[in-house]
């Protein structure tokens, strides 16, 4: 028992920095002044007048986010033991790791279901309605969170110490890994889109004035 307590304490303190650093990074990210690029009011107005169908990149990202939501909801239902045939087929034919008794995959899928899904809905809203300046920050935050979470999930499902019966079936390896990598990549692609062309998400400024002029006043 004393050995268990000693090992638990050592493991706890070794992992504490990895638990605290993301909170510190989030505080720094959301508290620092945003570096607003110089964009004219005319360009902002022109971008914000375009409908979703006239912004093909945003349209594709919206479709990908909808697919990610559907995939996340499916896996959430799977770990909640939903009796649907789709859930049964998925857990036994594609990702048996989700029923690993250690509980880690179940917790991950529930976190996705209750935290990632609402945020993805908000991001779809931001892609459809102009002036959502929070997209410039939250997309970066979400991209980092999903990349880390998916790295852990994919790595654990393929790890040699995971019982063989819970690993991804050989014949389903490519579709399962591709879907999981895509789930990690979509938020990063969205963050890159917001970073490289932020005009659609910026608040309108008086005509003829740049966003930099507004910031300086």
Summary of predicted features, one role per range:
Residues 1-78, 110-217:
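Eukaryotic polytopic
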Residues 69-100:
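Hydrophobic transmembrane helix segments
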Residues 95-115:
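Interfacial helix-start motif at the membrane-water boundary
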């Amino acid at each position: 028992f004393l050995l268990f307590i000693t090992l638990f304490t050592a493991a706890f303190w070794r992992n504490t920095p990895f638990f605290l650093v993301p909170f510190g990074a989030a505080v720094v990210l959301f508290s620092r002044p945003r570096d607003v690029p110089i964009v004219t009011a005319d360009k902002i107005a022109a971008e914000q007048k375009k409908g979703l169908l006239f912004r093909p990149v945003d349209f594709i990202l919206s479709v990908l986010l909808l697919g990610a939501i559907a995939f996340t909801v499916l896996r959430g239902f799977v770990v909640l033991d939903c009796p649907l045939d789709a859930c049964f087929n998925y857990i036994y034919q594609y990702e048996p790791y989700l029923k690993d008794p250690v509980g880690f995959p179940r917790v991950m899928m529930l976190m996705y279901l209750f935290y990632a899904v609402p945020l993805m809905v908000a991001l779809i809203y931001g892609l459809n309605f102009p002036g959502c300046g929070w997209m410039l920050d939250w997309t970066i935050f979400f991209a980092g969170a999903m990349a880390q979470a998916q790295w852990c999930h994919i790595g654990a499902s393929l790890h040699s110490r995971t019982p063989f019966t819970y690993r991804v079936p050989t014949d389903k390896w490519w579709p399962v890994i591709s879907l999981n990598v895509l789930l990690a990549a979509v938020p990063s692609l969205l963050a890159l889109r917001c970073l490289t062309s932020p005009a659609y998400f910026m608040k309108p400024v008086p005509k003829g004035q740049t966003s930099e002029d507004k910031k300086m006043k």
